[in-house]
């Protein structure tokens, strides 16, 4: 009888997280968050048109620290997802597929996302 307590290969416990896997997961995660935020943005637009009380509640919420934090991260996710999508388009054309280029462009995408987000918020 075989040992049933052994880890199944490949298993997450034996892998060391790499920037390529983390950026891939982050790209999918930001896509899900952005898709979900479209629904919330639609509710916000309808509230502006039809319900004065809900409009005032939403405006006061997005003026608060928590609302601004949500907007900060949604904009950060959008910038990251957009830039990483451009990176994927270059990969589809066959550019930047060497592992060193993948790592360099990954760090560039992270850096540009943070820089552009802070630029949007503070300038």
Predicted regions and their residues:
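Membrane-embedded alpha-helical bundles that constitute the cytochrome b-like, heme-associated redox core
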Residues: 1-123
